[in-house]
Amino acid sequence: MGVALTRLAQWTAAGYETGTLEITPLNESILNEITKFVESFSYKYPQEAKFVFVEPLEWKTYLEPSAFELGYVVSATTAESEETGKDGQPLLFLSVPYIKVRSFGQLSQLLSIATDSKLQEAQACIEANRDPVVKILGPDYNEMKEDPTRLTLLDTIIKDKETYMKRKVAILLKQLDLHLLNHSLKYISLEISLNPGTFKKDIELLKRFSGKGEQTVLESIEYTSDYEFSNGCRAPPWRQIQGEICYVLVKPHDMETLCLTCSTEGVFLNGGKTEEEGEINYERKGEIYKDLVTCLKDKSPVFSENMSKHEIRFTEEQQKDNQIFEKPKTEDGHSSVAGSEKSKIEKISFGKSPMTKRLEPSLNWRVTVDYKDHKSSIKDSQEEKQGKLEKSSSVSVAPSRAQSHRKGGEKVEETVSESSSESEEDEEPPDHRQEANADLPSEYWQIQKLVKYLKGGNQTATVIALCSMRDFNLAQETCQLAIRDVGGLEVLINLLDTDEVKCKIGSLKILKEISHNPQIRRNIVDLGGLPIMVNILDSPHKSLKCLSAETIANVAKFKRARRAVRQHGGITKLVALLDCGQNSTEPTQPSLYETRDVEVARCGALALWSCSKSHSNKEAIRKAGGIPLLARLLKTSHENMLIPVVGTLQECASEENYRAAIKAERIIENLVKNLNSENEQLQEHCAMAIYQCAEDEETRDLVRLHGGLKPLASLLNNTDNKERLAAVTGAIWKCSISKENVIKFREYKAIETLVGLLTDQPEEVLVNVVGALGECCQEYENRVLVRKCGGIQPLVNLLVGINQALLVNVTKAVGACAVEPESMAIIDRLDGVRLLWSLLKNPHPDVKASAAWALCPCIENAKDAGEMVRSFVGGLELVVNLLKSDNKEVLASVCAAITNIAKDQENLAVITDHGVVPLLSKLANTNNDKLRRHLAEAISRCCMWGRNRVAFGEHKAVAPLVRYLKSNDTNVHRATAQALYQLSEDADNCITMHENGAVKLLLDMVGSPDQDLQEAAAGCISNIRRLALATEKARYN
């Protein structure tokens, strides 16, 4: 931090000792980085945050004592922290307006309190404490010469804890210093763009658009000096040392003449020309702008307005001038202007910073590209697009090549069925382009200038431009779109098609970062980037393989990209990366060799994880032999490897073929083992994989046998990570389908914990929690446990939701609890039955069916069920009308509900009036055994009112019922025999049964071990026999 502040921070003319920080982009960047570092210090380094500074940092603050709340003793003019050092002094003391801070923990807390004024506080602190490192560590603490990235063995066994802690803080400060130096390079490297040629172009252009008319942008613009030095500068030599290039007098339409300084740092307003001597006051009077046009737009509203009218024409003129002025060779004038800055940079000691090495241009270039070669390259690529020339390799290639490559490589898209799990970015989002007049940050324009070097520069410029571009925050959308808008994506993709490894690596590193943006992803696919990346997977260079696979992982977030990867053979190559250790030819040290292999496999797994959201890709992974390799990688101890591996398995486990293979490869054992990991993300994906696989009974048993139920139950206690909680509760839900697992969960107190999760949780968690309770409550002991833990009320409260999956599960859980009379009383008191009944109107068939099933135990166990059902206005009519549904599950559940409703004679009369008999009869011709059983039971019950027996015969329900006796389901036999017994009370029905062969089938069932079936079959045969005897008797009489 000390080196960065002394050598890079820009101070006012008063100098480093007494001046203040200037308002410049570089200073603002340094302040932002320091603020981020201090803000995150408390939670990143909790032990180091407690270290007490040798001397307090003291400055004049903008904060008031009232801003400090918890953990502080506050009065009208003072505030002090309750936290104190060994000497009993507070670690933070504010006496308006001065503040003293003695630890990073308190500094971090202060910045969180400051919110909007945190940068002001940071600036005031740095200006008041010119060498903060000395105050923090003491004047005798020498600068470290060791590697700052690791502690030595001596450090770990040192007895003096205070010295040890000071050492760790010193390392962190050294790392911050290096970070600030590296981070500042992007501002220094971009000064290369501001040279005499740049300003000369801009001034000449503005002159063309200036004059006396109202539509002109300016009245006049001219240099203060007509003399031009050989290097292109017009500033005096002693000012050129400061980076100044020239001075211009600008007369806008709406204000007095402005005197502007054009320098390598930008454009700013100076003190103007003195009237007597005509000398220029060089002192800066305002902020620095990135160029002349931006400065004038800010100063003059009329200029801004008129400029917007001429924007297109002005841009065209600029592009014409670029072809004249822009040359890849560095001008001599430029080097002399930037000389002082270069010497300033060279003085900075970067130690062994990786940035230094990264900025060194390669000397081993195969081809030299100058301006003429570049023009011919464009011409070649245009001919190539028409198929007239063969593809050639070059470092700097034209943007049009990306398009020709794409068109040549495209195949006819096959029609594929994509997985239902593909919910991510399947819709094409609108392509947002930056507006011409948008108020864009300086980074946007700086990146665009770098892209120009990529397009037309020589090899050195290409490498430096790639390195400089990476120093920007490429996670920002502005930076990503800046690369795209100026044609940088095409260039980056074409650099992948060269033979230069460094160019490929630099390009892939940038593409990897910016491909997190959905628009950029789609642009990469449109430009044919994926086939090239897939080909790079065959490269012998492991670093290239890694970067290519990681970029594919980012891009393959939508259907078209996943399909493209598969169509170009990417799945097979990615699967091969999982086994790359056996195919490697790079001679390296054993430890490094193993590490690189692990990294290659990890990146391959990441890409497969993204691709595995497609059904066709899942099948391709399986056919390529991916499952055994994933199973082998699952045994590794590298957590960063395990996460994508388990993530891929989790996606693929939705397919039945995969679940069988997962069992065969004994993957469940390793999934269970990794549930005990400390990594929350790994726990989440393991639980999710178990959730997918536990549809199978054998898998549920394996989870129990390998001890997976206990860690699942223990993970329920940590509710902070909602994604992990959803995965864990999902795994518990599916495992609870097996009764043996439910017993174990009861032992581990999981049911009580699940009840506690019924409130204040997101729907993703609630669906699984309620599903698990629904399965657990099939057992009597668990129903009692849920009631005693107060689980009934939150379950009933969830009946008013709108989430389909949640409603299906909660109705099942409420229905399971309703089996117990005491729980049923609570449900009735909370108006739960009415809520269930209202769900019969839900548009989703699954919700209707689940609600109808839940009503069955409610009606069966209610104290006055008949009266309760009749109290629901229109409720019986609603139930009867549901018999018109096309959904078999809805029909079966409604028939079951009618069976219970019809136990009350008054209710039976009402549903008969609503036409239940013809609707039930209409359903008789079904082959679904579940529906057959409950339909037969409903018919049996409905026969007990009036002439319903006769009506069923008239509606031809008897003959289909006889066929039910041929089913293989004993439950269907019993229900059918009971229905036929009731129907056989009518003579015409007996005749129909006899004609359809019922007697023979019923005789076979009289010998059944099921007593109810025996009695019903015998009773039916008895009625048929009595009718036959009566007929015989009548004939002879």
From Swiss-Prot:
The annotated subunit structure for this chain is:
Component of the outer dynein arm-docking complex along with ODAD1, ODAD3, and ODAD4. Interacts with CFAP61.
Q: Residue ranges under compositional bias (Basic and acidic residues)? A: 316-334, 376-391
SUPFAM superfamilies in the record: ARM repeat
Tell me the compartments it is located in.
Cytoplasm, Cytoskeleton, Cilium axoneme; Cytoplasm, Cytoskeleton, Cilium basal body
Q: Does the keyword Protease apply?
A: no
An annotated GO cellular component of this protein is:
axoneme
Described by its record, this protein's role is as follows:
Component of the outer dynein arm-docking complex (ODA-DC) that mediates outer dynein arms (ODA) binding onto the doublet microtubule. Involved in mediating assembly of both ODAs and their axonemal docking complex onto ciliary microtubules.
Q: What domain of life? A: Eukaryota
Q: Where are ARM repeat segments found? A: 477-516, 518-557, 528-570, 615-654, 656-695, 739-778, 821-860, 864-903, 905-944, 946-985
- Keyword Nucleotide-binding, does the record have it? no
On tissue specificity, the annotation reads: Highly expressed in testis. In males, also detected at lower levels in lung, brain, liver and muscle. In females, detected in ovary.
Native organism: Mus musculus (Mouse)
Q: What is this protein called?
A: Outer dynein arm-docking complex subunit 2
Q: Which UniProt keywords apply?
A: Cell projection, Cilium, Cilium biogenesis/degradation, Cytoplasm, Cytoskeleton, Methylation, Repeat
